């Protein structure tokens, strides 16, 4: 028997039924589901110190369990001394089982470790059912050893769903246990 993450099992067993009842879908295929989660780090100082970018790639790989890809500047910005095509960040796109594992770890282990945590903003949806938020410190993840990091940096997390609007997407994430403050 293949391994199925706890959150994926919960989605199939409970969340689908609850959302069908709540939004009165005609078919279970209309129920929104998670498509992917993109975790990224922007490292502006990578212009001067390449070691910081390598450190960010390593940290993302430790946090997500998947190899990170370096991202490049789309256009030159003279004020930041950035040239087009210069590597200035890293990202990981999670799908399938690793996506559900990361979401479980984020909701139940990492976010509760944030100092004075009162929930995340529930209004950061993009109008198409996708949700993005920032994490100010990567050290909330247990995989990161505080003594071995170059510097404390933040992460961007984007959760892409198949929901057609923000209301359905928020309901889906609430069923997964996302701690919204509003």
Curated annotation (Swiss-Prot):
PROSITE patterns (alphabetical): RIBOSOMAL_L5
Gene3D superfamilies: 3.30.1440.10
GO molecular function: rRNA binding; structural constituent of ribosome; tRNA binding
Pfam families associated with the record: Ribosomal_L5, Ribosomal_L5_C
CC terms in the record's Gene Ontology section: ribonucleoprotein complex; ribosome
The keyword Cell membrane belongs to this UniProt entry's keyword annotation: no
Keyword annotations: Ribonucleoprotein, Ribosomal protein, RNA-binding, rRNA-binding, tRNA-binding
SUPFAM superfamilies per the UniProt record, alphabetical: RL5-like (SSF55282)
Domain of life: Bacteria
GO BP terms in the entry: translation
UniProt-listed InterPro entries: Ribosomal_uL5, Ribosomal_uL5_bac-type, Ribosomal_uL5_C, Ribosomal_uL5_CS, Ribosomal_uL5_dom_sf, Ribosomal_uL5_N
HAMAP family reported in the protein's UniProt record: Ribosomal_uL5_B
Protein function: This is one of the proteins that bind and probably mediate the attachment of the 5S RNA into the large ribosomal subunit, where it forms part of the central protuberance. In the 70S ribosome it contacts protein S13 of the 30S subunit (bridge B1b), connecting the 2 subunits; this bridge is implicated in subunit movement. Contacts the P site tRNA; the 5S rRNA and some of its associated proteins might help stabilize positioning of ribosome-bound tRNAs.
Subunit structure: Part of the 50S ribosomal subunit; part of the 5S rRNA/L5/L18/L25 subcomplex. Contacts the 5S rRNA and the P site tRNA. Forms a bridge to the 30S subunit in the 70S ribosome.
Family the UniProt entry places it in: Belongs to the universal ribosomal protein uL5 family.
Protein name stated in the entry: Large ribosomal subunit protein uL5
